[in-house]
Amino acid sequence: MAGPRPERHVLDNPALASLTGPHAHFAERRGRVLRYPVDVSPWLGLPDEPDADDWADLAALVGPGEEAPLAGFRGRVPDGWEVTFDIAGVQLVDNGIAAAPDAEAVRLGPEDVPEMLDLVERTRPGPFLPRTVELGTYLGIRRGGALVAMAGERLHPPGWTEISAVCTDPEFRGEGLAGRLVLAVAHGIRERGETPFLHTGAGNTNAIRLYEALGFRLRRTTRFLAARVPEHVPDGRHVGV
């Protein structure tokens, strides 16, 4: 007889844990499926083992023909869903990093979003949208008045906060700005009694080396997946009615 399943950790499904926890005020819900507003974050919270009803709810929430990001999902998408993006990723957690404030770092807010979007467009650290800054603290470094590096907070499972949007203008790379900002953001997270974590692509060896040098350790491999919603998704709730 099979024993009990091991208890799931909140970092195993961090988007769902965020949207049912500290970020619940952002959540748009249909059934057991949750999402952030489209101008805040693309991430969706899908149950660990979604059934046909969950996929139907996901389709209704996202819309036919639209792309559904399913970061961390390890299962198989249903027939008819077109996988549009699928790469290996890693999740790293604080393992004694030397978190510290940075004298040059400044708090970024809504008035800085145009510059933040421009920096993200030029450096491609991952999704950053007009209201992503509302998810937590974002810090930046300016040179000559221009924003040249930034990092901030994204997913927020209970007790944990993800560091994201870590990027540096190509002209200012090699000065250690990204590492300094990661440590500064981590300091704020630690001050709240929470633990920093982050994600990156498994092939992004430079970023992984940087994070490990700062004191992060690999917790698990993961998957960055997206699938296109088909035009029609059966809803199991209506079968036999």
What are these regions (language model features)?
Residues 44-50, 166-173:
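A short, internal acetyl-CoA/4′-phosphopantetheine-binding micro-motif in the GNAT/acyltransferase core
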Residues 127-137, 141-169:
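A conserved beta-strand-loop-helix scaffold within acyl/acetyltransferase catalytic domains
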Residues 1-11, 95-126, 232-241:
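Short amphipathic alpha-helix that is part of the acyltransferase structural core
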Residues 76-81, 179, 202-220, 228:
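Conserved active-site alpha-helix within GNAT-family acetyltransferase domains
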Residues 1-77:
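N-terminal charged segments
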Residues 82-94, 199, 217-231:
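Conserved catalytic-core motifs of GNAT/GCN5-like acyltransferases
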Residues 163, 196-200:
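Conserved hydrophobic beta-strand within the GNAT/NAT acetyltransferase core sheet
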Residues 53-59, 174-190, 208-213:
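Conserved acetyl-CoA-binding loop-helix of GNAT-fold acetyltransferases
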